[in-house]
């Protein structure tokens, strides 16, 4: 089992690396999901996520598509987008992923990994928003 600390990591790069690990059969736990970052203009990011959460079908709005508002679920959904979700292999890989807001008691004191290729120090521009800020904007509880 790999425990990854998402603090200061770029969400898309983190998700692609985690998806690869899951497809290789590893169990992955992501902690501090609310501290992952999304790069780009603040207003554009908020508008994009707001539009996603408001998407519905015209015939029956209860059919979806459904996009999450909580920060841990936003990270899970991003990883899911990088897996072959419609195949059995992709669904089994997705079940091996656990995402947490903060650090749960069961993982306190354990050593966390980080993904150097996904760290925000590689950014050329300081424009970014944390996943926690996006979740708060959408009305998420965490």
Curated annotation (Swiss-Prot):
GO terms for cellular component: cytosolic large ribosomal subunit; ribosome. HAMAP family: Ribosomal_uL13 (MF_01366). GO terms for biological process: negative regulation of translation; translation. GO terms for molecular function: mRNA binding; structural constituent of ribosome. This is Large ribosomal subunit protein uL13. SUPFAM superfamilies: Ribosomal protein L13. The keyword Ribosomal protein applies. Keywords: Ribonucleoprotein, Ribosomal protein. Disulfide bonds: none annotated. It comes from the Archaea. Belongs to the universal ribosomal protein uL13 family. NCBIfam families: L13_A_E, PRK06394.1. The gene is rpl13. It holds the Pfam family Ribosomal_L13. This protein is one of the early assembly proteins of the 50S ribosomal subunit, although it is not seen to bind rRNA by itself. It is important during the early stages of 50S assembly. Part of the 50S ribosomal subunit. Gene3D superfamilies: Ribosomal protein L13.
């Amino acid at each position: 089992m790999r425990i990854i600390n998402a603090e200061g990591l770029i969400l898309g790069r983190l998700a692609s690396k985690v998806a690869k690990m899951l497809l290789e059969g590893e169990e992955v736990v992501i902690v501090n999901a609310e501290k992952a970052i999304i790069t780009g203009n603040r207003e554009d990011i908020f508008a994009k996520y707001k539009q996603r959460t408001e998407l519905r079908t015209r015939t029956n709005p209860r059919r979806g598509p459904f996009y999450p508002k909580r920060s841990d679920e936003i990270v899970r959904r991003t990883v899911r987008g990088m897996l072959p979700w419609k195949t059995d292999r992709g669904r089994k890989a997705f079940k091996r992923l656990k995402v947490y807001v903060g650090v749960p008691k069961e993982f306190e004191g354990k050593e966390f990994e980080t993904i150097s290729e996904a760290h925000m120090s590689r950014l050329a521009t300081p424009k970014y928003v944390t996943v926690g800020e996006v979740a708060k904007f959408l009305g998420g509880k965490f």
